[in-house]
Amino acid sequence: MALSAAIILAAGEGTRMRSNKPKVLHTLAGKTFLNRVMDSVAALDPDTLAVVVHYQAERVAEAARSYNEHVTIVEQDDIPGTGRAVQCAMAQLTQKDDLDGAVLIAASDMPLLDTDTLDQLLAFHEKSGNGATVLTTILDDPTGYGRIIRDSEGNVLRIVEQKDANSSELAVREVNTSVYVFDAKLLAEAIANLKSNNAQGEFYLTDALEAAKANGAVGAFAAPDPLSVEGVNDRVQLAALAKAHNKRVCEHWMREGVTILDPDTTWIEDDVQIARDAVILPGCFLQGHTVIGEAAEVGPYTTLIGATIDAEAHVERSRVQETHIGRAANIGPWTYLRPGNELGEGSKAGAFVEMKKAHIGNGTKVPHLSYVGDADLGEHTNIGGGTITANYDGVHKHHTTIGSNVHVGAGNLFVAPVTVGDGVTTGAGSVVRHDVPSDSMVYSENTQHVVEGWKPEWER
């Protein structure tokens, strides 16, 4: 059905989160609550997507705009309540257009709200011919939620907020999810005369349903998946919801042919892609747009952030950010790959190696205790332990180039900018300050001095 507008309510503080940032900017599986709801709603292709802000308004508005530049920002005034939020939104939206069709309203603190559930809600609303439809769910513990009160025939009479409910109403387990569909014109009429005569002194959007009943049927659609409409009020709820969601994500990948040895300690964000026969060992965090190839092995205790791991590569006990690791490469343990690296097929970055903006050729090995930054290394080169590319002069970063088939001795220091040609051998402890031609050897003249019988001053 035609969706004239979608209004996302993001004005609240979320005091129970006990946070210095608005609740809607907290994250689940790598995305803020607000962005997750915006994704689901935008997929419905509304004519207008609006976000209502108030607490830390500019911060929330900027987060919304940076995620979707086409969003309309509505600032709620100091009059509290969800009803007032929708009044402000409708006043702004109807200044531009005469809304004609359906208006979807959704809270922004349901991070798992999905497009499929919203599609079903819209279809039910249209098929039923309702003037307004509320999305509901059944909870074992409905504490904190508005209760759906029906008559003996199952028709929706009203929604009663927790603080305004009597004992019989508190026993109701069907609750309001704070997602609604209204006929646009009916909504405009229903919110025009909202009053704040309730325990909270707020303008409740739920009161608009009672007003709407005079001009059109009010229905309720129960969400098929309660998890999709579960709200977050505090960090305890957030942790529980994140765990439940992550369990589903892990189960999805296991059914796709991925081995996850311990789903309870493996965390996988939504944008991660994993090929079949990959193996994920315990204690792994897979984040951002990470891609893991066929038969690759990750872990244990590894964090991948926006990394690409090609087939048959092995990454153990390491942190990898925005790095491409080639086929059958071997990373770790305790390797730190910062953004911008490209490691070739069969390459190695071993224990206590750090890399940044390094291009490592096929078969090249940096086995241990080294820093390689702003550098190009050719193919089948071996870097001795304790080697450093000194790339920073205090103001600018400089580049190091080391060719193919180079043997670098232990404890070398390359003072960039410097280029070492193909087939070079460097002596242990060398400090390489100047370019080295191909097929040569370079070493530093470090004279060893021995002082016999020497003792420190305090022992003399």
Swiss-Prot record:
Binds 1 Mg(2+) ion per subunit. Its main location: cytoplasm. The active site is at residue 368. In the N-terminal section; belongs to the N-acetylglucosamine-1-phosphate uridyltransferase family. In the C-terminal section; belongs to the transferase hexapeptide repeat family. The lineage of its organism: Bacteria, Bacillati, Actinomycetota, Actinomycetes, Bifidobacteriales. GO terms for biological process: cell morphogenesis; cell wall organization; lipid A biosynthetic process; peptidoglycan biosynthetic process; regulation of cell shape; UDP-N-acetylglucosamine biosynthetic process. Residues 257-460 are annotated as: N-acetyltransferase. It comes from Bifidobacterium adolescentis (strain ATCC 15703 / DSM 20083 / NCTC 11814 / E194a). Residues 1-235 are annotated as: Pyrophosphorylase. Pathway: Nucleotide-sugar biosynthesis; UDP-N-acetyl-alpha-D-glucosamine biosynthesis; N-acetyl-alpha-D-glucosamine 1-phosphate from alpha-D-glucosamine 6-phosphate (route II): step 2/2; Nucleotide-sugar biosynthesis; UDP-N-acetyl-alpha-D-glucosamine biosynthesis; UDP-N-acetyl-alpha-D-glucosamine from N-acetyl-alpha-D-glucosamine 1-phosphate: step 1/1; Bacterial outer membrane biogenesis; LPS lipid A biosynthesis. Keywords: Acyltransferase, Cell shape, Cell wall biogenesis/degradation, Cytoplasm, Magnesium, Metal-binding, Multifunctional enzyme, Nucleotidyltransferase, Peptidoglycan synthesis, Repeat, Transferase. SUPFAM superfamilies: Nucleotide-diphospho-sugar transferases, Trimeric LpxA-like enzymes. This is Bifunctional protein GlmU. Mg(2+) binds at residues 109, 233. PANTHER family: BIFUNCTIONAL PROTEIN GLMU (PTHR43584:SF3), NUCLEOTIDYL TRANSFERASE (PTHR43584). It catalyses: alpha-D-glucosamine 1-phosphate + acetyl-CoA = N-acetyl-alpha-D-glucosamine 1-phosphate + CoA + H(+); N-acetyl-alpha-D-glucosamine 1-phosphate + UTP + H(+) = UDP-N-acetyl-alpha-D-glucosamine + diphosphate. It is found in: Cytoplasm. The gene is glmU. GO terms for molecular function: glucosamine-1-phosphate N-acetyltransferase activity; magnesium ion binding; UDP-N-acetylglucosamine diphosphorylase activity. Acetyl-CoA binds at residues 391-392, 428.
